[in-house]
Swiss-Prot record:
Residues 30-54 form a coiled coil. Its main location: membrane. Specifically interacts with isoform RGS9-1 of RGS9. Interaction is decreased when RGS9-1 is phosphorylated at 'Ser-475'. Component of the RGS9-1-Gbeta5 complex composed of RGS9-1, Gbeta5 (GNB5) and RGS9BP. Predominantly expressed in photoreceptors of the retina. Weakly expressed in other areas of the central nervous system. It is found in: Membrane. PANTHER family: R-SEVEN BINDING PROTEIN (R7BP) HOMOLOG (PTHR21029). The chain crosses the membrane at residues 213-233. This is Regulator of G-protein signaling 9-binding protein. It comes from Mus musculus.
Length: 237
């Protein structure tokens, strides 16, 4: 039960960390907006909550000396995957901090990625104003105010990693995977190929179509008659 719970938490953390990673890649680009910065804040907070919950359960499980060998090995594999998620989260938070400081939203700036679209857009922007954009205008310093909080959270994640390594000593190089890297992809591809091959074999092994057999017979007879006529003409000449 504890292992399944840890797997579920780790799966949620993995997805949230991946989502945060993709969001960070757009900071400083032409699609960078206050909506994005708010989404980044919510996503990293969710990731930190999941990290705390996952780390607590894995720590309790791995410090249990009554665990069976196979059960401990499985928890150690989960621990290594969890450590990788935390490392990625910390690196992405540091990247978001650096990009957020370099590309503030409400300041003259050049976007990190340019779309090539130019021209006056003030009239279109005026028509596109909404309640949310007006609220953003009132909270124009959101991204600047969030940077100190993000910096503190980066330090907290680093401290969490150090604290975990002090509580549970699981060297990553001692944990063996149950299957080779990318085995899921290879197994899926082979399953698809085998199913396709099975279909083609069944199609080839099916009964012969009578109409096709009749057409082949007629064609063979016509061909034989043509060859016989050609031989007769050759002898007469």
């Amino acid at each position: 039960m504890a292992r399944e719970e840890c797997k579920a938490l780790l799966d949620a953390l993995n997805k949230t960390t991946a989502c945060y990673h993709h969001l960070v890649l757009t900071v400083g680009g032409s699609a960078d907006t206050q909506d994005l910065r708010e989404e980044l804040q919510k996503t990293r907070q969710k990731a930190r909550e999941l990290a705390v919950a996952t780390g607590a359960r894995l720590t309790v499980a791995l410090r249990d000396r009554s665990l069976a060998t196979e059960e401990r090995a499985e928890f150690e594999r989960l621990w290594v995957a969890f450590s990788g998620c935390l490392d990625l989260l910390e690196a992405d938070m540091q990247r978001a901090l650096a990009l957020g400081a370099t590309f503030p939203l409400h300041a003259p700036r050049r976007p990190l990625v340019r779309t090539g679209v130019t021209g006056g857009s003030s009239a279109v922007a005026a028509r596109a104003l909404s309640a949310r954009s007006l609220r953003h205008e009132a909270e124009s310093d959101f991204d600047v105010a969030d940077l100190p909080q993000l910096e503190r959270e980066v330090l907290q994640v680093g401290e969490m990693i150090d604290d975990m390594e002090m509580k549970v000593n699981v060297p990553r190089w001692t944990v063996q995977a149950r299957q080779a890297a990318g085995a899921e992809l290879l197994s899926g591809a082979s399953a698809g190929a085998s199913s396709a091959g099975g279909i083609s074999v069944e199609e080839r092994a099916g009964p012969c179509d009578p109409s096709k057999a009749l057409a082949a017979t007629v064609f063979s007879a016509v061909l034989l008659v043509a060859v016989a006529l050609a031989l007769c003409v050759a002898k007469l000449s």
